[in-house]
Each structure stands twice: as C-alpha cells, then as structure tokens.
Amino acid sequence: SSLFFIPVFLKANVGSDWDSYALIGTYVNFIDSGIYIPSRPPGFPVFEILIGLMSYISNYLGLNNFEQGLLIVQFLTLVSLNVLIYNFFNKTGNKKSLFFFLIVLSPIYLISGLSIIDYLLGSLFGFSALYLALYKNDLNYHQILISVLLSLAIGVRLSNVIFLFVILILFLIKKENLSKIFIIALTTVVLSGFLYFPFYNNLYNFYTDTNI
C-alpha cells in the first residue's frame, strides 16, 4: 500500500472521484458562508468534520497542500482496516493469506483508500463494531463501545446502518439478552441522531431565515 501511497501523496492528488471534491467543497462552503450544504444527500457529517479538522491541522503544520493532510489520514485508515481484516482472518484459525491479499490489493479497495472518500473510514468503524460483537464480549463497556463505533460509521455514511442490523441479528442468533440488544439499538440511534441533527438544523435555519 505504501508504494501506491507515496506518489499520490507527493502529487497531493485527492483522486478522480467527484465526490472527493464535493466533500471538500462542503467544508469550504461552511467556512466561507457558515451554511452546511451536504456534499451529497443525506450528508456525511463525521467525514466532513474530519476533512475540516485535517484542513486546519495541515495549515497549522505548514504542509504545502492541505490535501496531503487528508491523504495521510486516508492512508492511516487504509492501514488500520488492513490490520482489522487480517485479525478477522486470524480468528478463523486459518490465515488464508491469498484471500487477504486479494482484498487489500484489489483495485477498487486501493482506489478508495487513496482517494478522499468516505467508504473506508465507515467500514473501519463498522467492522470494528462487528469485531467487538464477535470476539470481545468480556470487554468493559462492551455495549457502549459497539454503539459508539456504529454511530460513527453511520455518521460517516448513513447506509452503514447495515452494520447495526447485522450486529442485532448476530446477537439474536446468539440468543443474547434482549435488554442488551435494545440498549445497543437505542444508543446507536440516539448517538447517530446527535451527529446529524446540528448539520440539518443549520441547513433548516438557513432556509427558514431566507424564506427559500
């Protein structure tokens, strides 16, 4: 992955996907006008916040291009997801190296990992929650950690709610306590709502104040 990352980083190339520029545009527009306009409906608040944060940090550190700061975060996300995928394979008792490398070196996976796009970060949070649900039942604050990770995944991309359904079904199959299942579902929904609400409240106030 590093061999592919270095030339992309040096050129500060955020990728050819228009969605990458739309995400950056959401942050720039908010800074310029104070108005939140989703990069694409229904919005990707966690990733858009991350873009804003890294743009600020990049400027503070004096990087030549703020895009380089974003690419560093994206690369670290890629590496973290690679490690997580490897851990999933390890838990099966068979490393299955061929399948692991087929995943982490597949063109679609690498392109997503080296572009400023939200897929990998959402997957990292979602699969981390699934990993805890499968293998870390004895962990302190198990339910809260799962809910937080799921909420972040949903905050990155709303369609990541699929991870919540998978984990709830998994717990039902394992005949976990129904109160535990309910707490995870409720906490995830509430936390996800908190992530989306400020942004849509900002957009709603803009439209009502300007009578659009």
Predicted segments, located by residue:
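Membrane-lumen/periplasm interface segments of specific transmembrane helices
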Residues: K180-I212
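Transmembrane-helix motifs of polytopic, lipid-linked glycan transferases
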Residues: S1, Q68-G93, F125-S128, L132
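Loop-to-helix entry region of an early transmembrane alpha helix in multi-pass inner-membrane enzymes
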Residues: P41-P45, I49, N59-V83, S112
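Short acidic/glycine- and proline-prone juxtamembrane loop motifs at membrane-interface regions
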Residues: R40-P41, I111-L121
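Specific aromatic-rich, kink-prone transmembrane helix
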Residues: D32, L84-N87, L102, L121-D138, ...
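Extracytoplasmic catalytic/substrate-binding loops of multi-pass membrane glycan-assembly enzymes
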Residues: K11-T26, I37-M54
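Membrane-interface alpha helices of multi-pass inner-membrane proteins
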Residues: F100, Q143-R157, L164-L168
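Perimembrane helix-loop-helix junctions
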Residues: Y135-L139, I162-V190
